[in-house]
Amino acid sequence: MQVLPPSSTGGPSRLFIMRPVATTLLMVAILLAGIIGYRALPVSALPEVDYPTIQVVTLYPGASPDVMTSAVTAPLERQFGQMSGLKQMSSQSSGGASVITLQFQLTLPLNVAEQEVQAAINAATNLLPSDLPNPPVYSKVNPADPPIMTLAVTSTAMPMTQVEDMVETRVAQKISQISGVGLVTLSGGQRPAVRVKLNAQAIAALGLTSETVRTAITGANVNSAKGSLDGPSRAVTLSANDQMQSAEEYRQLIIAYQNGAPIRLGDVATVEQGAENSWLGAWANKEQAIVMNVQRQPGANIISTADSIRQMLPQLTESLPKSVKVTVLSDRTTNIRASVDDTQFELMMAIALVVMIIYLFLRNIPATIIPGVAVPLSLIGTFAVMVFLDFSINNLTLMALTIATGFVVDDAIVVIENISRYIEKGEKPLAAALKGAGEIGFTIISLTFSLIAVLIPLLFMGDIVGRLFREFAITLAVAILISAVVSLTLTPMMCARMLSQESLRKQNRFSRASEKMFDRIIAAYGRGLAKVLNHPWLTLSVALSTLLLSVLLWVFIPKGFFPVQDNGIIQGTLQAPQSSSFANMAQRQRQVADVILQDPAVQSLTSFVGVDGTNPSLNSARLQINLKPLDERDDRVQKVIARLQTAVDKVPGVDLFLQPTQDLTIDTQVSRTQYQFTLQATSLDALSTWVPQLMEKLQQLPQLSDVSSDWQDKGLVAYVNVDRDSASRLGISMADVDNALYNAFGQRLISTIYTQANQYRVVLEHNTENTPGLAALDTIRLTSSDGGVVPLSSIAKIEQRFAPLSINHLDQFPVTTISFNVPDNYSLGHAVQAIMDTEKTLNLPVDITTQFGSTLAFQSALGSTVWLIVAAVVAMYIVLGILYESFIHPITILSTLPTAGVGALLALMIAGSELDVIAIIGIILLIGIVKKNAIMMIDFALAAEREQGMSPRDAIYQACLLRFRPILMTTLAALLGALPLMLSTGVGAELRRPLGIGMVGGLIVSQVLTLFTTPVIYLLFDRLALWTKSRFARHEEEA
């Protein structure tokens, strides 16, 4: 029977040691809560950090970019600009389309933003053109966010117009109703319509004009209320044949009489079933298709949204004819799941490595089981808190748990090692557990709260970067806190029941060999430490050198923002000469598609040509290249992009810009390259002067590649210069001229055909097959005030000019975006600095302002990094100062930090990695890790001075030897916890590797140096404290 120690021993652990059943059940409750939480947690690529974003699209077929800007975009922008919480407003006005993107503050709920947008649209309605075919339509989506899923719909037996009609009605609408879906777009533009192609010569010969035809069609096809009859006994609803449904009915429409004979529409026009917009087209691989892109709402969970679509697809495709084939070409969640699976595997690997290192040091199965239980218990228990905080299982939270593997075992190791030491001295397990746990309790609290203090500044980071790492910091802090609780409750209780002198003394051949090895290492360390203490100034110079070296490395290391991920999808923009037509662009696109599909890494390709709100001009095309899974291709995405661009360079007359899709999207515009830089002015003239000059300079910079601009001001324009005096004499107004031109060349939507399921348009235009180009303008006829027909050429001259193909605004002012990539041998920091230097040399006028796009977040993150690290150090100093009731000891502990910085930065440079936000988080974590060596040394040195009356030198020397094994064990555990991240090669490895590299490098260097520098600095500050006390005492005596 064991004699129980006094109730004063054991500290907070005593209750749990003495009540094993209650302690066990408490831990089981934590375990069950964590398991339930894990099953309830959603899965995503990254924490949800999207800005609330809404896109407003207005289509006005036939309108020029200038008309779209002044008549549609500007009135809407004025209303939107008055909304509270608006962070940024950008717009793009192109031929027939206006797209306004509204990005709100992170704190504004999306539903509130939606209400404000709807109110603003309502307020602007009276200012918009009266003949606008449809009112502005808004969607809760970020247009720069790549689709979560892309589907291609093809058919070998049906025309594309019928295919799109069925897909829009039976598939797209249903998918739009799924929770989390923000927008479903159908690219390909094959919406059914009745197209009326007027024969200009025929109507001119009959003395008619296109306006006569338009008036006749709109008057003949109506769908309005007619009333009802209510008699004494019966009620009758009135109806009529006021609707025409088919092209054949329109052919028979009488548009005028001449000499008593009817003139039917079919006599002067070709009337056929066709597409609403003939200048739109989409292809899947080499086959014409309807391409369906599904985008999520900002903040929606991508995995659950995609799962819902997958579940609904079989049911939707069953409603389509068998000749219609629906193919899922890309699904971003495939790579997200693979990335999360790889991270989970690395987490399990980290746990296995940590348990292995524990056994290597403790050489005892019962002693290994105890921390082996503490690690998974701490990690699994964290899931319960994550559910409560609405977190998700994503790459960052799993990275936090992987790193936590090395952290959470530290507490258990320190407790076990201390209790084992007393058992080996002959004390009973229960007494040793009470004594050891009570003695080490303060150290555990110091380790825990000082490490959590390092994470506090991460919670106060602003904007999107702060939101991004909040889940990481809190997840890690919760795991560390649960670990501390487990180490002060379950660990000493298990030590009291599972450890004994016999089990600790029982050794096999491996145990004896490893014991001798550790004894030799400790002896060698003791000899080295004695020499270092005899030459303190040399050691201090090494410590100062690491501080200076860390500053130099910080200055010179390449800096980036966020690792470029390989998600298996490449977005592309194909650019042709600005005067390119739709037919010309479609042909070039097919040539490029043939080249791309020959690459062995490419699985499928979708492409789109035309202007419909997603593409700005006819001379550009959008491409989405879907790569094979990572394990089925030899190269990562950057090498594939380089290879594709080299191959496409052989296609004449086109430029191809490619960039890999990323899980983190900050910009609101689809860009040609990875990074953007904007020039904003008060007028388009200022941009036309300075953009070419800046582009010329930037294209010469070696720090940039793929430099391009969306400034296109060489679009061909046929300017109709009307002689107003001549027109007025003939009774012809400018409205008559505009109407005649719009009727002929605007694919004008003049009437609507209503059916039970959908609505279709009647499109009016001139048949220009026999009069191509500017010659078609000679066929335009106008009606004078006396009823005569007047050629347009008699009152107007046609001038060929140049004008912008699209007009972009940022916060209501003209803007152009310069896109660029960064070559492999340079960093984003180099590129940003080179752009800023170039900007200074040009001496831009004051009315031109510049701003970075996604790189603005990089500048903001980089600017706050130093303060973030300073805040972490200050937070730790405050916590340690409170815990030790000392101003000096925290400085001794913090003196270990420069060594970690040197190791991390050197490792990143050797590995060729940039110092990005992921690596910076690793350095901040190192601040919390490496100080534990000093804490364990100083705690025992102070206890030896206080309880055994040792001198500071003897106390710190003994503390270093006594704590060498747990220090080495905990450092190796943390290192092995980060090792799987450093060696990661699977999907999403680009995101995880910088964290692992920085931590492994920092831990190795700090472990080697702090074992020697910390004792010397401890003695230095001890002498400084004695000298300060003596000075104060002398002053008091003199006083």
Swiss-Prot record:
Q: Where in the cell is it found?
A: Cell inner membrane
Keyword check for Transmembrane, yes or no. Answer: yes
Leader peptide range in chain numbering = none
Q: Which family does it belong to?
A: Belongs to the resistance-nodulation-cell division (RND) (TC 2.A.6) family. MdtB subfamily.
Transmembrane parts of this sequence? 15-37, 345-362, 367-389, 396-418, 438-460, 472-494, 535-557, 866-888, 908-930, 967-989, 999-1021
> Native species of this protein?
Shigella flexneri
Q: What is the membrane topology listed in the Swiss-Prot or TrEMBL record?
A: Multi-pass membrane protein
Q: Which SUPFAM superfamilies match?
A: Multidrug efflux transporter AcrB pore domain, PN1, PN2, PC1 and PC2 subdomains, Multidrug efflux transporter AcrB TolC docking domain, DN and DC subdomains, Multidrug efflux transporter AcrB transmembrane domain
Q: What is its main location?
A: membrane
Protein name in the entry: Multidrug resistance protein MdtB
One GO MF term: xenobiotic transmembrane transporter activity
GO cellular component assignments: plasma membrane
The record ties this protein, via HAMAP family, to: MdtB
Q: How does it assemble?
A: Part of a tripartite efflux system composed of MdtA, MdtB and MdtC. MdtB forms a heteromultimer with MdtC.
Q: In which domain of life is the source organism classified?
A: Bacteria
Q: Which UniProt keywords apply?
A: Cell inner membrane, Cell membrane, Membrane, Transmembrane, Transmembrane helix, Transport
- Do you know which NCBIfam families this protein is assigned to? PRK10503.1 (NF007798), RND_permease_2 (NF033617)
